[in-house]
């Protein structure tokens, strides 16, 4: 892709958190993503990625280990590992590294208002423009091992985790 923003949206990093997958499928069915390619668009690439397909298929948080806690050691992330989730980290890390904007969609097991967590100070303005009830800026530096923490290594990247509300509640999608 030439110039423009390279956007990555991940869903299903935790397999039992499927509201993001449902929402992305609904948006695709409604033609939303085609609208992003207007002539004046600053978007050059959009990647939609299921973070943990095996866990999504099993409707389980994870298969072997929590994928959203193992993005710590760069060498291990880049080479993968023995567990199912560790085998996913090289491709997911590469996709994050290639993006200029990263949106990671999650949901919660308990009733929760929609909120987001920006990965860096440069992501706060974007977070505040999203249709969420609040932004948790206090968690900027406390999420080690997550895909959001991995994304924050590039201070210029806009990266936000959105917790959409309770799993599969209609208002969460």
Each PLM stretch: what is its role?
Residues 1-173:
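Structured catalytic-domain cores with a bias toward divalent-metal coordination
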């Amino acid at each position: 892709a030439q110039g423009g923003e390279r956007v990555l949206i991940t869903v299903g990093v935790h397999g039992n958190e499927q509201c993001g997958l449902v929402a992305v499928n609904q948006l695709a069915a409604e033609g939303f993503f085609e609208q992003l390619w207007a002539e004046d668009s600053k978007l050059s690439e959009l990647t939609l990625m299921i973070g943990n397909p095996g866990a999504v298929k099993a409707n389980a948080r994870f298969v072997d280990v929590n994928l959203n806690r193992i993005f710590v050691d760069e060498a291990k992330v880049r080479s993968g590992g023995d567990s199912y989730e560790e085998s996913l980290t090289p491709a997911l890390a590469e996709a994050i590294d290639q993006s200029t904007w990263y949106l990671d969609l999650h949901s919660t097991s308990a009733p929760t208002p929609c909120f987001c967590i920006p990965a860096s100070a440069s992501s706060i303005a974007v977070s505040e423009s999203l249709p969420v009830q609040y932004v948790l800026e206090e968690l900027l530096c406390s999420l080690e091992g997550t895909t959001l923490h991995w994304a924050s290594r590039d201070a210029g990247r806009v990266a936000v985790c959105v917790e959409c509300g309770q799993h599969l509640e209609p208002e969460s999608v």
